[in-house]
């Protein structure tokens, strides 16, 4: 009698438009479509890392219940519009940006001055309208975070750094705007009682829909891993399984060659020159170690970090008992 549970053999990703996609997986055993679909949906809505404006200082404004001469919107509406700007920070957790504009016209997210490692996904988003003689001068603090954090929580926590005119915002960090899932019927040979899981997701553009699904699955795997270690005492780290060499089980992605990361030819050749053939080899290197690699500069390093981050990995991770026995080091 067959006792092994079926795992999906078919994965289909359908782009539905800008920042929208539909991911379909089949077949699942009966009931697993709802079990996994609901879990992924909840993680996508609550636990994705994103970026948001958290504090604002506007020249000449002491509090949010003010108006500015020459600006059509009052401060409350300016702040509401600012919350709609989608930021993306590369290799940093926070940044303070400046916006200065005067004269008649529309103020958009494009007017925010950004360094090279900060990206504005929707530069045409309108923040305010200036009339003749109007001026808007503001400092915007953008931070990396997870979920939704009300401003009053951070306002009291940061009381020691409070300054006159500092306006603390409610921050919605989640890059996921909408998620829904459906479970359809699937068939394998004579079995017709199987599930097909279809997840439809829309993001704000700071992360692709496919990467969001991958990240949510990674979170679920890490959280559920502790249930496999119910022996009491300290829990072994998921990424560093203990045991004699050859007995450890690693995340399958770590056993894949670095070629699957689809890095530029320059970056890939630099890694191979340092005997880095597998993703598990790569994540154990630190930034400083990679920067010492001949011909591998900061641009290549940033590329590597972004590709790893899209898969829920970082540099500087520790893996005990690596490499596993029998791994071809070429």
From Swiss-Prot:
Query: According to the UniProt entry, what is the EC number of this protein?
Result: 2.7.7.6
The record's GO CC annotations read:
cytoplasm; DNA-directed RNA polymerase complex
Region of interest: Alpha C-terminal domain (alpha-CTD) = 250-330
Reaction(s) catalysed by this chain, per the record, are: RNA(n) + a ribonucleoside 5'-triphosphate = RNA(n+1) + diphosphate
Q: Which stretches of sequence are listed as region Alpha N-terminal domain (alpha-NTD)?
A: 1-231
Q: Which Gene Ontology terms cover its molecular function? A: DNA binding; DNA-directed RNA polymerase activity; protein dimerization activity
Question: What Pfam families is this protein classified in?
Answer: RNA_pol_A_bac, RNA_pol_A_CTD, RNA_pol_L
Q: Which keywords fit this entry according to its UniProt record?
A: DNA-directed RNA polymerase, Nucleotidyltransferase, Transcription, Transferase
Matching SUPFAM superfamilies: C-terminal domain of RNA polymerase alpha subunit, Insert subdomain of RNA polymerase alpha subunit, RBP11-like subunits of RNA polymerase
Q: What class of enzyme is it?
A: transferase
Q: Which Gene3D superfamilies match?
A: 5' to 3' exonuclease, C-terminal subdomain (1.10.150.20), DNA-directed RNA polymerase, insert domain (2.170.120.12), RNA polymerase, RBP11-like subunit (3.30.1360.10)
Q: Which CDD domains match?
A: RNAP_alpha_NTD
Give the record's family classification: Belongs to the RNA polymerase alpha chain family.
UniProt-listed HAMAP family = RNApol_bact_RpoA (MF_00059)
Subunit info here reads:
Homodimer. The RNAP catalytic core consists of 2 alpha, 1 beta, 1 beta' and 1 omega subunit. When a sigma factor is associated with the core the holoenzyme is formed, which can initiate transcription.
What is the recorded name of this protein?
DNA-directed RNA polymerase subunit alpha
Q: Which organism encodes this protein?
A: Paracidovorax citrulli (strain AAC00-1)
């Amino acid at each position: 009698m067959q006792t092994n549970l079926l795992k999906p053999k078919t994965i289909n990703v359908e782009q539905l438009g800008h920042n929208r996609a539909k991911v379909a997986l089949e077949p699942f055993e009966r009931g697993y479509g709802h079990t996994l679909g609901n879990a992924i949906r909840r993680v996508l809505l609550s636990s994705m890392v994103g970026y948001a404006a958290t504090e604002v200082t506007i020249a000449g404004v002491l509090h949010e219940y003010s108006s500015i001469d020459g600006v059509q919107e009052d401060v409350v509406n300016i702040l509401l519009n600012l919350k709609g700007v989608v930021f993306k920070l590369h290799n940093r957790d926070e940044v303070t940006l400046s916006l200065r504009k005067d004269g008649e016209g529309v103020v958009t997210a494009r007017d925010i001055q950004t360094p090279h490692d900060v990206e504005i996904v929707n530069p045409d988003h309108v923040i305010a309208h200036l009339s003749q003689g109007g001026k808007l001068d503001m400092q915007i603090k953008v931070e990396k975070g997870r979920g939704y954090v009300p401003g009053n929580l951070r306002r009291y926590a940061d009381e020691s750094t409070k300054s006159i005119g500092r306006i603390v915002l409610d921050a919605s960090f989640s890059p996921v705007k909408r998620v829904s899932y459906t479970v359809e019927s699937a068939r394998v040979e004579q079995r017709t009682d199987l599930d097909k899981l279809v997840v439809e997701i829309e993001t704000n553009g700071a992360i692709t829909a496919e990467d969001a699904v991958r990240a949510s699955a990674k979170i679920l795997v890490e959280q559920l891993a502790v249930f496999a270690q119910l022996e009491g005492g300290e829990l072994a780290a998921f990424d560093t399984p203990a045991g004699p060499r050859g007995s450890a089980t690693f995340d399958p992605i770590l056993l894949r060659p670095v070629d699957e990361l689809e890095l530029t030819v320059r970056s890939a050749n630099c890694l191979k020159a340092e005997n880095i053939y597998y993703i598990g080899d790569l994540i154990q290197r630190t930034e400083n170690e990679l920067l010492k690699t001949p011909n591998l500069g900061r641009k290549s390093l940033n590329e590597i970090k972004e590709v790893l981050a899209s898969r829920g990995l970082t540099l500087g991770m520790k893996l005990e008992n690596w490499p596993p026995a029998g791994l071809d080091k070429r």
